[in-house]
Amino acid sequence: MRCPKCSSEESKVVDSRQAEDAIRRRRVCESCGFRFTTFERIEEMPLLVIKKDDKREPFNREKIVRGLVRSAYKRPVSSEDIETTVANVERKIRQLDSNEVESDVIGEFVMQELAELDDITYIRFASVYRSFKDVSELEELLKNITKK
């Protein structure tokens, strides 16, 4: 690791600790004695979302957050609940072992999480996500919820 003070390539690790999503390493330059900290993180592959029209765009977790905030409006769903839901969805996506995922799959993951969180938020999200054509489709969803 190059020393930020003298640019020497010779340094040694004097301490390693687990940080949130990285390994924190305390280093000492063997040339000038300067102490510095580095972080080692896993490089995650960028996720691409395959839209209904087959276009691909980078995964944007904020889109999920916005959709959930809209669906949870005036509901007893905290911002922490929303953040946890999004984190769970992103974890499920990354477990697919692919750097491309269809938007439908993301929507289904969100629906699975919302079904456990709040029924009204689930219905609101589903009504937009599934684009119900008539009331009978909504009634079918409601029947499935009341069976729980």
UniProtKB/Swiss-Prot annotation:
Keywords: ATP-binding, DNA-binding, Metal-binding, Nucleotide-binding, Repressor, Transcription, Transcription regulation, Zinc, Zinc-finger. Binds 1 zinc ion. It comes from the Bacteria. Its cofactor is Zn(2+). A zinc finger (unnamed) spans 3-32. InterPro entries: ATP-cone_dom, NrdR-like_N, RNR_NrdR-like. Residues 47-137 form the ATP-cone domain. GO terms for molecular function: ATP binding; DNA binding; zinc ion binding. GO terms for biological process: negative regulation of DNA-templated transcription. Pfam families: ATP-cone, Zn_ribbon_NrdR. Belongs to the NrdR family. PANTHER family: TRANSCRIPTIONAL REPRESSOR NRDR (PTHR30455:SF2). Negatively regulates transcription of bacterial ribonucleotide reductase nrd genes and operons by binding to NrdR-boxes. This is Transcriptional repressor NrdR. It comes from Lactococcus lactis subsp. lactis (strain IL1403) (Streptococcus lactis).
